[in-house]
Swiss-Prot record:
Organism (species): Xanthomonas oryzae pv. oryzae (strain MAFF 311018)
Protein name stated in the entry: Diaminopimelate epimerase
GO MF annotation, one: diaminopimelate epimerase activity
Similarity comment: Belongs to the diaminopimelate epimerase family.
Catalysed reactions, semicolon-separated: (2S,6S)-2,6-diaminopimelate = meso-2,6-diaminopimelate
Catalytic machinery residues: 82 (proton donor), 227 (proton acceptor)
Principal EC category: isomerase
Site feature location: Important for dimerization: 278
Length: 284
């Protein structure tokens, strides 16, 4: 068990994927997932353990999967997709002996993901098919998918691509990612009525056709050192515009990810590191 109901203690593992950090809880014994207040308390970097998201390991939901996982943002809200988290869950399952093959399946809140164990502590995860249709993102006010959308925001016009990778993303191409107004524009887009479920906002700079730089302002978290689904979103939006090749390196503040999308009718595959930091016990 991860939770000791008699004492209030909670055992956990701290992990990160390219700097996107997680508190991982083993709930396969049926222990209830954290409520919003507990998730926010655990994620607090001053009064809790500290992380971007909480990951809960649970019993599998689909045939053939070895386990499932839930995702909780640092503000206590539930999330539906987390690419860096998927790699960390995969590594945790391998370390615990639950996943014993080089290839296996895990269930996220939105779908089943095929995972491949690579060399050097890296994992590849099939992230599903990108959805560009506005109702699927969801993006209100647009009937058909476009390469670029424009929204008036506080007197300015913000131009962006939009896609769902199991969660909504807006992708803003910039000349210099270091100078991008990440928090200001990210917050304005998240609060815009065009995104009824809010949105993760990526700011991407094309270095060359095989390399981009990216910063992501995540809903429920803020700017993170890395965002796996955000890296997928930025890559596929640029691929649709023929700005980059179908196999691209994404440099984020916390590390490097590789995104491959062989063709429009195949799944996006993300690969990158999964790192164990420490195991601990939270006393509540």
């Amino acid at each position: 068990m991860s939770a000791d109901g008699r004492s209030g203690r909670l055992r956990f593992t701290k992990m990160h994927g390219a700097g996107n950090d997680f508190v991982v809880l083993d709930l396969r014994d049926g222990t209830p997932p954290p409520d919003a207040a507990l998730a926010a308390q655990l994620a607090d970097r001053h009064f809790g353990v500290g992380c971007d998201q909480i990951l809960t390991i649970e019993a599998p939901r689909s045939e053939g999967a070895v386990a499932a996982y839930g995702i909780w943002n640092s503000d206590g809200s539930a999330a539906r997709q987390c690419g860096n988290g998927a790699r960390c869950v995969a590594a945790w399952l391998v370390r615990d002996g639950i996943a014993q093959c080089e290839r296996f399946i895990i269930d996220s809140p939105v779908t089943a993901h095929a995972v491949e164990r690579l060399e050097g502590g890296r994992y590849a995860v099939a992230m599903g098919m990108p959805q560009f249709d506005p109702p699927q993102i969801p993006l209100a006010g647009f009937a058909h998918a476009r390469d670029e959308y424009a929204l008036p925001v506080h007197g300015d016009t913000v131009r962006f691509g939009a896609v769902s990778m199991g969660n909504p993303h807006a992708v803003v191409e910039v000349g210099r990612v270091d100078a991008a107004p990440v928090e200001r524009v990210g917050t304005l887009l998240q609060q815009n009525a065009a995104f009824p479920d809010s949105v993760n906002v990526g700011f991407v700079q094309v270095v060359d056709p095989t390399h981009v730089r990216l910063r992501v302002f995540e809903r429920g978290v803020g700017e993170t050192l890395a965002c796996g689904s955000g890296a997928c979103a930025a890559a596929v939006v640029l691929m649709q515009r023929c700005r980059v090749e179908r196999d691209v390196q994404v440099s984020l503040p916390g590390g490097e990810l590789r995104i491959r999308w062989p063709c429009d009718h195949e799944q996006v595959v993300m690969s990158g590191p999964a790192v164990f930091v420490f195991d601990g016990e939270w006393n509540g």
